[in-house]
From Swiss-Prot:
Cleavable signal peptide: none
PANTHER family attached to this UniProt entry: HEMK METHYLTRANSFERASE, MTRF1L RELEASE FACTOR GLUTAMINE METHYLTRANSFERASE
Protein name as annotated: Release factor glutamine methyltransferase
Pfam families to which the protein is assigned, alphabetical: MTS (PF05175), PrmC_N (PF17827)
Organism: Listeria monocytogenes serovar 1/2a (strain ATCC BAA-679 / EGD-e)
InterPro entries, sorted: DNA_methylase_N6_adenine_CS (IPR002052), HemK-like (IPR004556), N5-glutamine_MTase (IPR050320), PrmC_N (IPR040758), RF_methyltr_PrmC (IPR019874), SAM-dependent_MTases_sf (IPR029063), Small_mtfrase_dom (IPR007848)
Residues annotated for S-adenosyl-L-methionine binding in this entry: D142, N186
Amino acid sequence: MTQISQLLKKAEAILFEKGLDQNAAEILLETRMGLSRSELWMEISRELEPNHEKQFEEDFARYLAGEPVQYILKTAPFYGYDFLVTEDVLIPRPETEELVACAEAFLKKHPVKNVLDVCTGSGIIAIALKKAFPEISVTASDISAPALVVARKNALLLNADVRFVETDLLEAFKQNEERFDMIVANPPYISEAEKAEMSDYVLKNEPSLALFAENDGLAIYERFVDNLKYVLNSSFWVGVEIGYTQGERVKQLFEKSYPHTTVVIHKDINSKDRYVTCSNILV
């Protein structure tokens, strides 16, 4: 049998040589063993059980072949929770947590009854908000049926009472004349021109339906903003994640359609434009 320290040393040398994330080996091993990072290091001189060693070898080979750690383990952290992720949904990004935090800050100050999360994917935004504010009604939508399967499983696993609807953006709610006080969205916003700058890990594994949009990445925003008037109450707050080059253009879309509202571009922790909010607060 092999010691944990020996296995990690060998794996990390391979990762270093290939220019890959050297934390990947530890993450794969600790997750499969059900240990925290500190617990793994306390056991560093221990010999691995054959089943754990075999599982690590299989996982490590998949990672070296280009599969993201989150898809291998089928889990990803977001906002203090562990979410199920599959190839049908995007891997949660830390930047999206900042949009959730902004929405939470608004919810703490203003009475809101109905919240809608558009392009929900794995359900991370809707579920995080429902866990923080169990008294509000939360609906989440996506055009992808496979993504909604994952989102429903996450809601069940995390005991979050969220309603899920399969629809193209706001169409179902527009047809049913439903109205919301708050709408959050993390839509596809990457342009085709940006593909050359993207990691192969993303391009080869994550669903393109959730990544790319036409018209320089703005096509989904244009349809979304144009139809908001059919589904918003008179007092509302809208927050959308954006690409770091899209702030002014998305702001202009909101200002053109809703000239008497407050539209703000917010920067992320790296000082890049990351989300835009549009609000009309009457209460």
